[in-house]
Amino acid sequence: MKNFFSMHAILLACSAGAGLAAITQGISEGTYSRIVEMATISQAAYANLCNIPPAITSAGKIYNAETDINGWVLRDDSRQEIITVFRGTGSDTNLQLDTNYTQAPFDTLPQCSGCAVHGGYYVGWVSVKDQVEGLIHQQASQYPDYSLVVTGHSLGASMAAITAAQLSATYNNITVYTFGEPRTGNQAYASYVDETFQATNPDATKFYRVTHTNDGIPNLPPTSQGYVHHGTEYWSVEPHGPQNMYLCLGDEVQCCEAQGGQGVNDAHVTYFGMASGACTW
């Protein structure tokens, strides 16, 4: 299969807006493998963690019946990591959260001055906040040398982003991997994430916002409603591999977002050849 776009076409596509986004082609094998591993866990969350790596065990379930937010706190003793993963949209209740674009003040994180986040996802976060913080505190107390990882796809990606921002007030060893993440907050929130996780510095970042070809969900909610993406975008094109990952840094309209995808499409439900909940990998 040919590459999804030539580099020339990518640069043209990314030149919309005030200026040209900075594009870097290729990432290391190690970073790519790590991203794919987190994508596996995020996609498996749609089917009760089917086919996750055998070294990873569940330390507790996250669930709220009113919002239908689902997730797990996991532990990988081989890597000394405590992993929190959120499932993406899996019900009409979740869809109601998805479409609540009214921004909500990020009141649970007063350190984030002026920050507002997606109203539906904030409702989701508040509904499970105590569970998440309790489970992570339990694991972090028992395994104080372990680092924290937060991940998720789609709705789960925004939940992961909000969770990581919240946890940053307590922990300083957090790495985040999101897949098909919608825009999650306003400029103040995006700036907070960028600063906290060094998200605009590919050499030091602790936040990997991964997109895929023309996935339509990263185009939502629209910027006209005050939403802004945070950090460097890690754009995956096909055929999948470390050399077909592009780091897109700069303008809001960049790589995936510039391809015209709208809403849930094939590129959204499949990342690195793994369909959400299909468990065929």
UniProtKB/Swiss-Prot annotation:
Q: What is its main location?
A: secreted
Compartment annotation: Secreted
Q: Which Pfam families match?
A: Lipase_3
Per the record, the domain of life is Eukaryota
Q: Which GO-annotated molecular functions does the record name?
A: feruloyl esterase activity
Which keywords label this protein? Carbohydrate metabolism, Disulfide bond, Glycoprotein, Hydrolase, Polysaccharide degradation, Secreted, Serine esterase, Signal, Xylan degradation
Q: Which residues form the signal peptide?
A: 1-21
Tell me what this protein is called: Probable feruloyl esterase A
Name the gene for this chain.
Answer: faeA
